[in-house]
């Protein structure tokens, strides 16, 4: 990071005393902008200021209050909540800017440059590609082929473990937990009806499988957010993350076997097409080869469109409409990422980021404590917003500072951010995944949570591996990691 922005190397102690040498790119932009005007837009308080966190607290409070009143986490759209927080941030900044001799234009410029961070803009386009891929794959029949192939190959008494594994494969291929829940719940409900299994149990298994890919997939928005905010390569984060969740996968699979019962599933109605699997195979293979995610998803999208048109799933016109639908389904998330970037820039100027960083690290004396503080931060943000991507984007800059301060590998930091945010979404009764499963199955969200075994075990093993410092051997050379990720 130091080499990238041309800053002079600073010591750990000096890091928090030089706004130009630390933190995300928005701090550099703020300072450069102020320098051009002969002013330094610095918060002036090296320990930070709690006022800088008020916009975020207002957002969380509004979200929790609206959810508590209506019982629906979707009552207040995230973009509206963040917009309100941004308005308050500008109000709080106005007084400080006046005292510092800066104008409203300076705040707007800093906000725009915070939202225009190269990491966020790249993330913006990757999110749009992920939405296009999801809609194209669904429209040309790839989703149904993947699900049916898995069920057809499994013995009847392995249906429940198989449902979990199919959820893992499907979510890893699609990169979306919501898409996986939507695709598998109809199958899960049918299995429950035929075998007499508990509906909440089946819902919990589907959600568990969905959260596997949400956490690990190369095209998951959480993976994209975690790796881009920490400036590490996806394959490095995948290796570290997979080792940390592997015990949770194994134990969940074993629990499914014990809960499973013989089922007479009519497999003659399950059809699949080998050619339709190509987009999923392509995106997984290219990603594992280290091909940039934009190129990997682009190739898979083109393959899906070509196959869909050739098989009659799309016409040229409907293919374009499907691409448009994909953009629409992710444009909210993409826009929110940019809004959060601008909000965090203003919060940083107010001293909120430094205050939170100071409080989180005040009593931290080791890399282990730093990792636990990062895990706690992203989990709390996720439970409050029920959006693991936004929680990672918000916590990412702070986590990067903490990891640099205590020599924690950014690869490990990215893994912790993604693991704990996904685990939080997988057990939160008002999160979208559980709400979707409960709505389709007609059961209570709270009845599903105890059966979300994988997400619960993610918490258990995530904390356990932080405490024992495993997996070992991860590079702590964060500058080198950043250079690799930038290529």
Predicted segments with their positions:
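Juxtamembrane and boundary regions of transmembrane helices in multi-pass small-molecule transporters
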Residues: 7, 208-211, 215-270, 275, ...
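Interfacial loop-to-helix junctions that mark the boundaries of transmembrane helices
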Residues: 45-48, 69-81, 114-117, 150-155, ...
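Structural signal for alpha-helical transmembrane segments and their membrane-water exit/capping regions
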Residues: 48-105, 126-140, 174, 258-259, ...
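Core transmembrane alpha-helical segments of multi-pass membrane transporters/permeases
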Residues: 79, 83, 91, 106-141, ...
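Juxtamembrane helix-boundary/capping and inter-helix hinge elements in multi-pass membrane proteins
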Residues: 100-102, 116-117, 196-200, 225-237, ...
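Membrane-interfacial loop-to-helix junctions in multi-pass transporters
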Residues: 117-123, 147-165, 192-202, 270-278, ...
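Hydrophobic alpha-helical transmembrane segments of multi-pass integral membrane proteins
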Residues: 124-133, 153-187, 361-400, 417
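Alpha-helical transmembrane segments of multi-pass membrane proteins
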Residues: 157-170, 196-213, 369-382, 406-427, ...
